[in-house]
Amino acid sequence: MKLYSLSVLHKGSTKANLLKATYDLSSFSFFQRSSVQEFMTFTSALIVERSALGSRASVKEQEYLCHVYVRNDNLGGVVIADSEYPSRVCFTLLDKVLDEFSRQVNSIDWPSGSPATIQYTALDSHLARYQNPREADAMTKVQAELDETKIILHNTMESLLERGEKLDDLVQKSEHLGNQSKAFYKTARKQNSCCEIM
């Protein structure tokens, strides 16, 4: 999972104006980087130009996904990521960046601004921080921890059982389980195994 580009643009009446952008092109060869950066800048501007105000969209371009959010105040943002990167995290990043940008940069400067004149330096740190969606996004982090816990729990249950022993056999042998509990276990086991392929 990788983020390649994070851009902030102003959607004008005829074209989009790039205000600030940052790129992580380390996965491309040195000789490709300038061409790739130009392509990403062009694509970001084109997507913002063609997006309606107040809209969010994800556009597939080859093996990349371009996530765009254009606010009602004509401020737009684009994240270019690989197809594995979670889109929900991209839109969270765009929300955060555009809110922060609109607080720090006066809206009067948006139509005529350029990367050289706009004083906003947080894009690099946001792109670096969001490279790992699990660390950057609380929801993704909780999901990863939950998946880890399920794996540990499953492994713990397997290790509790002795070699060759099955949970079904233990339930049958148990003196502490009542007949009703044993019947419940068998019924649940049958219902859960109805979809298994033999």
UniProtKB/Swiss-Prot annotation:
Lipidation (S-palmitoyl cysteine): C194
An MF annotation (GO) of this entry: transferase activity
One Pfam entry name: Longin
Record domain v-SNARE coiled-coil homology: where: 138-198
Record note on modification: Palmitoylated; catalyzes its own palmitoylation. Palmitoylation is required for Golgi targeting.
Residues with lipid group (S-farnesyl cysteine): C195
Record key words, sorted: Coiled coil, Cytoplasm, Cytoplasmic vesicle, ER-Golgi transport, Golgi apparatus, Lipoprotein, Membrane, Methylation, Palmitate, Prenylation, Protein transport, Transferase, Transport
Locations listed in the record: Cytoplasm, Cytosol; Cytoplasmic vesicle membrane; Golgi apparatus membrane
Topological category with respect to the lipid bilayer: Lipid-anchor
Gene Ontology biological process terms, A to Z: endoplasmic reticulum to Golgi vesicle-mediated transport; protein transport
Enzyme class, broadest EC rank: transferase
Keyword flag Protein transport: yes
Function of the protein: Vesicular soluble NSF attachment protein receptor (v-SNARE) mediating vesicle docking and fusion to a specific acceptor cellular compartment. Functions in endoplasmic reticulum to Golgi transport; as part of a SNARE complex composed of GOSR1, GOSR2 and STX5. Functions in early/recycling endosome to TGN transport; as part of a SNARE complex composed of BET1L, GOSR1 and STX5. Has a S-palmitoyl transferase activity.
UniProt free text on domains: The longin domain regulates palmitoylation and membrane targeting.
Protein name per Swiss-Prot or TrEMBL: Synaptobrevin homolog YKT6
Organism: Danio rerio
Source species taxonomy: Eukaryota, Metazoa, Chordata, Craniata, Vertebrata
Gene: ykt6
